[in-house]
Amino acid sequence: MDLGINHNADFTKWVVSAGLLTEPFVLIDVGVQGGENIRWRPLGDHLVVHGFDPIEEIVQQLTEENRGRSNRHYYCMAVGNADGEQAFYFNPVNPSESSMYERRADQSDKNASEQVRTVPIRRLDSLLAEGLVPKADFVKIDVEGFEKDVLLGAPKLLRAGAVGMETETNFGVSPAYPKSHFGTLAELALENHFLVFDIAFNRVPRESFQRALVHKGLKPISKLDSLGSPATVNVLFGRDLIDEVDHQSNYQNPCRPFSVSQLIKSIIVCELYSLNDVALDTAERFADRLGAHLDVDRAVRLLADPDCVTNEYRRQIRAFELSTSWRITAPLRWAKMLVFGAPAEASKSVDS
C-alpha cells in the first residue's frame, strides 16, 4: 500500500555526492512511529528529520537508536490545531492504532484495550514561530484520522517553503469529515497549491462477503489488494511548479516564488517517489535556472530511468526467474502441469 519508492534515485545520489544540494532537506514527520521511510536514505546526512509522536515509548526508542546523530530530532507530543494538552487513546496491543479519537463503541475488537493518556499538543506554526522547528521541505502525516487538525495548525509552515506532503487518508465520511476525509485534506492541500501527485491504497472486502466465502467452504480473502472498496489510502501531494508558472490563473490565491534550492528539492521528491517523468519534465522546463547550478543534460539522463518504479520484490522475482536453476527446471514444471493439471486455486472459477 506504500507509495512508490525509487531504489535507484540516481539524480538524488548525484546532487548529494557532488555537493549540488547546498542546504539540508528538512522532513517533518508527524506520526513518526517506526522512524522515517527508507525512501529518504539517498539524501544521506543532508536529511534533517523532526519527528513527532505522542507515544513516549516510541520517541524514547527512536532517540536512543539515533543517539549521536545531530540531524535527527524526536519530540514526544501530539501535533494538531491547538497548543496545550489533550487526551490521547493509546492502544498497547497495537500502538499503530492509537489515536487522538476514542475508539467507537461499535468496534468490537477483543484485542483492543485503550489507555487514556494526557499528552502535550502543539501547532506546527507555533513551533515554527518559536524556532523549535525550521522551515520544512516536506511534511508526512499519519495520525489515525487527526490529519485535518495537523493541517489546520500548519498553514504558515506549509507556505514557508514546503514542496510536498504525504498523508494517510480514506474516502469515508463522518461528523468530523462531512466532505469525506480525502475531500477535506485535498481542499486544505490545494489552499497551499499542493496537487495530488500519486495515490496508493489497499482493498478490504466486507465482512458479510468473507463470512459467505467461509460458509461456502472457501477461504476468506487475505490479500488486501484483490477485492473490495479502497480502504486505507496514502496520497502524495506536491507543488506543480510548471503549472504554477504557466497557469497562475488556475489558482485562487497568488503563486509563491520558489528558489533554485526548492526547485532541486522538488525534483528530488518526485524522483524518490518514483515520479521520474515529473522530475525530468521539471528539470527541462527550468533548465535556464538550473543550468547555473548543475549539468541539466546529465540530470535529464539520470532521471530518464524506466526502472524507477520497479518494485523491489518484483525485481527479486524477475532475477530468480532469469536464474539458471529456474530455467533448467522449467521443463519439469511444464511436465508436472501436463500430468497433474494446473493448481486447483488457479483454475477454480468464481462461479464454482
Describe the role of every protein-language-model region.
Residues 1-319, 330-351:
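Phosphate/nucleotide-binding beta-alpha loop and adjacent structural elements of enzyme active sites
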